[in-house]
Amino acid sequence: MKRLSSVAVLLALAGPAVAGDLLSVYQEARVSDPQYGGARASYLAGQEKIAQGRAGLLPQLSVNGSVNYTNLDARFPGSTFFRGGQHDFASDSFGVQLTQPLFRPINREIYEQGKLQARASEIQLNAAEQELMVRVSQGYFDVLLAQANLEFIRAQKSAIAEQLAQAKRNFVVGTATITDTNDAQARFDLANAQEVGSLNDLEVKNRALATITGKYPGGLAGLASPVSLLAPQPADIGAWVEQALGSSLQVEIQRVAVEIAGREIEKSKFGHYPTLDAIASYTDSKANSSAQGFGNALRQGVIGLQLQMPLYTGGAVSSRIREAVANKTKAEQDLENARRQSALSAQTSYLGVTSGLAQVSALRQALRSSEVSLESTKLGREVGVRTSVDVLNSQQQVANARKDLAKSLYDTILAQLKLKQAVGRLNEEDLAAVNRLLSKQ
């Protein structure tokens, strides 16, 4: 009772529960998962790189102005024209300048890099979405497996309790020894301990899923029975590896990174190039007095070209070129690493699916055999050739077979999703296909 009370308190503190199937939990996670939310924000930030890069190619308009008060003590020895002495006067000016870049190759490279960075942020968001699908599925099936384990243990505990009661009755009437009772009691105590551990494991798995969805899970749909899983198509591990090398999102991200690094080399080289801008400006200034003793008003309009040619930068440009070349080499190595990791991921997931399907088939047969063996053992006990301990062992074997089958099913489904993720093709329709394997409990 104390354990159940503790669980009730934990449930109350967990907040609103989210119930439903895999798709509904995924939709909840899209809204609430902080990792995916951060990826969305990064995507929006990355898209701004295009506008920022384009700005360097467009006209720049600026305005300036000033208002000044001057106190001047002037002396003009020997001058009969200029008045010396103390002068106080105010002045103000206003100006507008328009600059249009005509030749700024660095700005062009920044714009091209911005487009690539925006593309990279889009791919990263897609990768984050696929990763969210896998994390939600993993968390969802972890909860289902923990629930199944708890159900198996409770069923086993119930069967042991019946055997314990029967052993006690048989001992009283003299048809069984105290050994049978002690053995059943030991198994019952162990089942109690396993139940406590399973309850804790279920709580941990529920809370792990809640960190993704923001809500405590409740009433999740489980796998329907029977479940039919399909083999990967094409049934060729090499074909899946080729797809991963060509369309893996991690590989695509690194390809874009190599392009960006190449653009950075070109941008650095353009540090040796001149720049040319078209300039147009207008200035209006006036003062009510001056050192000469009279005021002035000036209006000036200027239009022209401004050329800047770097002659010597202390070796900074050459250093930046070497740095950019080294960074591109690193990006190329990162690309190769991404290709190898994607190939390994595709191979691992493919083998996980194929071996999982074989294991599911074998475990189904093992479960059928265990159930037949249990019935035979029960019959043997009735005729006196088997003991209650034999029945308990057979029941434990059935429970283990069911638990192993459930885990194998969940692992195989996850491997199927990860295989699609490895080749960059995991989408919501794949989750919908898994969802169709579920039924409300």
Regions found by a protein language model. Give the residues of each.
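Amphipathic alpha-helical coiled-coil segments
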Residues: 38-53, 128, 132-152, 162, ...
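A glycine-/polar-enriched beta->alpha junction
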Residues: 27-37, 44-59, 95-113, 123-130, ...
